[in-house]
Amino acid sequence: HDADVTLKDIIAFVPKLNANPFFNTNRNTNLQIEGHIRGKVNNLKGDDLKVTLADGTYIDGNFSSQNLAVKQEEFLILELRQLNTRVSTLRQLIPDFNPPSNFNKLGRMRFSGSFVGFFVDFVADGQLSTDLGNAAVDMQMRLTDGPERARYAGNLSLSGFDLGGWTGSDDFGLVDFSSEVVDGYGLTGDLASARLTAAIE
């Protein structure tokens, strides 16, 4: 049940995965995998899975997927006990995922929770710990038109979050707040807008 493979090794057995942007872009990425994987490529499931990448990215959890070999129809359900990674790694791994550069300031991210949906249209619910502080998220996000036209809604709470470090402004410091985001649009500073109800503690 343990394996040390590259994605191109998997593609060699399942050529249809060449059509999948994740597999195609990351074909030389080395994975250490432990756990139980079963099913066919377009209906794959994994239990008690632990995956480690060379850059220190670590995933511990369960997953089920559909249509991995069908471009733009890849659907995932992830139940994550732990995801430890950086935004720069997610940019390389997830097709069309390119949030603004200030997301890099989050540094090493540790997430536990769930992810349900497509790479560019999903719901994420869980706890996030970053180099700038902590967050609890329950958000629906649609990135089908890119980060400039992203649409999102849900709940976000920040705890001990360095808003000054995030924005690059000395006018802000550490914040604790809970918010409900409605009709969020855009992830870039010049275009972003949303209706927000927030309680600052």
Language-model-detected regions and their locations in the chain:
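Helix N-terminus capping/helix-initiation residues
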Residues: 6, 86, 162, 187-188
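Short intrinsically disordered, low-complexity coil segments enriched in acidic
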Residues: 1-18, 79, 89-91, 197-201
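Structural signature of outer-membrane beta-barrel domains
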Residues: 54, 83-85, 131-133
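Short beta-strand/loop motifs in extracellular/secreted proteins, especially
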Residues: 152
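Flexible, solvent-exposed coil segments and beta strand-coil junctions
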Residues: 12-17, 28, 39-43, 90-95, ...
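Extended lipid/amphipathic-ligand handling interfaces
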Residues: 1-3, 21-23, 31-42, 48-51, ...
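Outer-membrane beta-barrel translocator/channel fold
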Residues: 85-91, 164-167
